[in-house]
Amino acid sequence: MSKVNLFLDSSALFAGIISSTGAARALLLLAESDQITVTLSEQVVAETERAIARKVPQALADLRAAILASKAQIVNDPAPAEVRANLHLISHSADVPILLAAMKANVDYLVTHNRLHFIDDPDVAVKANLRIGTPGTVSLEARSFFVPPYRSDTGF
């Protein structure tokens, strides 16, 4: 069985760095232990670096260490012409490059905390042909990919 491949946007990656117990952190730890694959885009890395430098600069080293430890695949950003040609995919034009990068990476899920632009509009997932969710919902939905079903010797 192949590992589930999750594309984390900057909100999910940021949460995974600053929280020691949240679902986003758990996803990074699963990637570190080779149970899942994490994919990021160049833009996600740059956005997250800027946000951490601005809000919690002492965590910049943690971000870089987590990206290396998780063996994250970093994909190229889409070309500007490709972004312009796909503005219809999502209402917030700044999110088009993230959506396109996830689509092109052929991931199993796009993981985000950005409910307003990605999750609350179900057409985004349909148009992009992607499953999209928060770290918490994705970790529950994807559980079957990395947790074997429980089998009891007693039949329960």
Task: List each model region and its residues.
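Alpha-helix/helix-capping structural signal
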Residues: 11-12, 43, 116, 137
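Acidic, PIN/NYN-like endoribonuclease modules and their adjacent C-terminal/linker elements
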Residues: 108-109, 115-156
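Active-site neighborhoods of divalent-metal-dependent phosphate/nucleic-acid chemistry enzymes
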Residues: 73-116, 120-124
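PIN/NYN-family metal-dependent endoribonuclease catalytic core
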Residues: 8, 20-55
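A short acidic, often aromatic-flanked loop/helix-cap motif at beta-alpha or helix-coil junctions
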Residues: 46-47, 80-85, 135-143
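Nucleotide phosphate-binding site architecture
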Residues: 14, 46, 119
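Metal-dependent nucleic-acid phosphoesterase active-site entry motif
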Residues: 1-21
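Domain-scale selection of a single, long terminal region
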Residues: 42, 46-82, 98
